[in-house]
């Protein structure tokens, strides 16, 4: 291949690859909470990426209480963000669950499972962590969903 042919090949290849670059616009869902620089979710194409949700209620106050209280608040928060993004739990494909206590694992599974159709659960990672950003957080969950 001559030098000119190599240059032409490189130009054509790079132009083709550049044309395939993902240029989908990003849509940011939700306002930053309590001055933290994070969106509740980001939509791109047919995907929705939901930030980790703690147990804040609609007034921005932590749902103080036992684990079931916090777990239900987190799941309700995620439900609201998914709805705002145009999707729901039936379209969630992946979740990441962070728990601060191993003793909450069974209760987490019980409540978590109630949000899905039996046998149609998303992929999930559950991790036990030493702590979360607020000392009273018992858990945090993030998820990824797709749009119709």
What are the language-model segments listed below?
Residues 5-76, 80-93, 99-148:
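N-terminal presequence-like segments and the immediate start of the first folded domain
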């Amino acid at each position: 291949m001559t030098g000119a042919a190599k240059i032409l090949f490189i130009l054509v290849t790079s132009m083709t690859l550049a044309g395939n670059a993902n240029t989908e616009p990003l849509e940011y869902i939700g306002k930053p909470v309590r001055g933290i620089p994070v969106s509740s979710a980001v939509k791109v194409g047919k995907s929705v990426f939901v930030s980790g949700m703690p147990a804040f209620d609609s007034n921005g106050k932590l749902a103080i209480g036992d684990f079931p209280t916090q777990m239900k608040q987190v799941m309700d928060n995620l439900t609201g963000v998914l709805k705002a993004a145009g999707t729901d739990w039936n379209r969630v494909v992946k979740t990441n669950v962070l728990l601060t206590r191993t003793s909450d694992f069974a209760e987490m599974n019980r409540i978590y499972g109630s949000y899905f159709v039996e046998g149609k659960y998303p992929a999930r990672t559950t991790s036990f962590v030493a702590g979360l950003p607020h000392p009273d957080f018992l858990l945090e969950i993030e998820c990824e969903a797709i749009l119709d």
